[in-house]
């Protein structure tokens, strides 16, 4: 049994089964749907299809990050068991949750001076963030010490690529994730914008693609261009989707066709309710390991 805990926020958008199997702990963000508050608990409080159907019908959503008090109570359960902690946060480019974790860390280190609490800004989101967590769990299982796993995360977090497209950027604009000008372009008939996450963990529109068929090809082209080893890529590949499984499956099929050396099949996950509050339904995101991201 490891002497430290690997932990993240629920916004890593893996399944409960995946977190449990890999022994990755998580703490939940929160969101409101039409003024009723829920935990972003991997679809347990509200099934994903119900959540996205409500959004499509016009329901309002508002998210709230984990606060310092919640982090303190969460971290303390591990410290009381004599465990050190490696916690990886949702990207500081789209959330202030890193600051909450750092406040809790400072308070707890005074009370538990013999324990280590290491915090990493993932500079990632959704299952791309989850892909990083999965690799950190591999290193822990190989017997790597806490500091070595932390160093790996800090040195390699920008090698997780995040590419995604949506048929509607309305929710991205409403949530402040992209500008109104970019959203207006994305709203033109037949246009499917292709975005990625830059080296500061921000969402950046990159291409304006006409038709969904072409954007599916283009997103896989980006994987070919940026993946570690190109078409010989032998790492894992994750996809997240918000109520558009058929589109996600089409991307996965093309990835599996063009990258025969993948480590297993493409894993398709749901975009969780925190990230989904800002994407709305209709987003497909592709995640893989590659060369370091740039602005």
Question: Residue ranges of each PLM-predicted region?
Answer:
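Mixed-charge interfacial surface used for oligomerization/domain docking
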Residues: 3, 11-19, 24-30, 86, ...
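A general secondary-structure boundary signal
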Residues: 3-5, 79
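Positions that flank functional sites
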Residues: 34, 93, 201
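Glycine-rich phosphate- or other oxyanion-binding loops that anchor nucleotides, phosphorylated ligands
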Residues: 56-92, 99, 103, 150
């Amino acid at each position: 049994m490891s002497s430290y805990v690997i932990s993240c926020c629920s916004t890593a958008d893996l399944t409960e089964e995946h977190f449990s199997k890999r022994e990755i702990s998580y703490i939940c963000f929160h969101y409101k749907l039409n003024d009723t508050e829920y935990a972003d608990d991997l679809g347990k409080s509200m099934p994903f299809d119900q959540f996205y159907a409500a959004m499509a019908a016009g329901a309002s959503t508002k998210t709230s990050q984990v606060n310092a008090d919640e982090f303190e109570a969460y971290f303390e359960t591990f410290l009381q068991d004599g465990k050190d902690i490696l916690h990886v946060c949702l990207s500081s480019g789209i959330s202030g949750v890193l600051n909450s974790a750092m406040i809790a860390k400072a308070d707890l280190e005074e009370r538990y001076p013999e324990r280590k609490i290491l915090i990493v800004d993932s500079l990632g989101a959704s299952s791309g963030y989850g892909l990083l967590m999965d690799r950190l769990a591999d290193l822990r299982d190989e017997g790597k010490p806490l500091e070595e796993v932390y160093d790996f995360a800090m040195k390699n977090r920008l090698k997780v690529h995040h590419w995604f497209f949506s048929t509607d950027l309305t929710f991205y604009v409403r949530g402040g994730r992209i500008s109104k000008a970019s959203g207006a372009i994305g709203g033109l008939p037949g246009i499917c914008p292709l975005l990625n996450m830059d080296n500061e963990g921000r969402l950046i529109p990159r291409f304006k693609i006409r038709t969904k068929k072409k954007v599916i090809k283009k997103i896989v082209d980006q994987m070919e261009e940026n993946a570690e080893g190109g078409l010989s890529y032998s790492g894992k590949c994750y996809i997240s989707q918000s109520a558009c499984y058929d589109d996600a499956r089409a991307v996965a099929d093309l990835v599996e066709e063009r990258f025969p050396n993948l480590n297993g099949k493409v894993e398709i996950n749901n975009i969780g309710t925190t990230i989904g509050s800002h994407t709305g339904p209709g987003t497909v995101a592709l995640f893989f390991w590659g060369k370091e991201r740039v602005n």
